[in-house]
Amino acid sequence: MRRFIFADEAGDFDFSRKQNVSRYFIVCAIRLNSCEIGHEMLRLRRDLLWDGIPIPDYFHATKDTSFVREKVFSLIENQDFDIYAQVLEKSKAIEKVRASKHVFYKYAWFYLLKNTMPRIIEKHEDQLMATIASIGVRKGQQDYSDAVQDVLAQTQRIDAGSWRTTFCSCASDPCLQVADYCTWALQRKWERGDSTWYDRIKSKIRYEYDMWAGSNSHFY
């Protein structure tokens, strides 16, 4: 059986306590057995446009109006998918882990997939297609792509020829927009203590782990 994961991230790679810098970095993946939810997202967009609701090129939780967010969450909370999230409090990362953006990104992905791959891939015969939201500008994107490829190679439970990865903008795939919404809800909970939207999807969360929850050590 072919399984699908769509993943996004929240937070930044600024390891400082300056204003407007995230406290956490979160990698969030949703697992689907089919991509029907993507068709439902497109149908919702068309319906909203028909009703005269201004919608940009795609759904994006940070920029969408509260009215549109409500419509999207009303849709996705009734769909069948699983959510997996690795949460890293950046100030607790030792120096070698935050030596570069690339290293830190790879670290987050490694522990997410290490701890969730047995749940994502149920049988050795399964196939996996991983679609990851591209990060920032095109320059340097290959480093992040290589990081995820390497992590998958280390953690996958199926033959190397049975999985594929692709990196693209959220605009290119409505299932990535679902991942964006889930990641946004998680970030609101962790950064602001606001679980309003998180509560709408929490029944779908199969893994949500604060990497260094047991540590009181901060390194900046």
Residue ranges and their predicted role:
Residues 1-220:
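Phosphate-ester processing/binding pockets and catalytic centers
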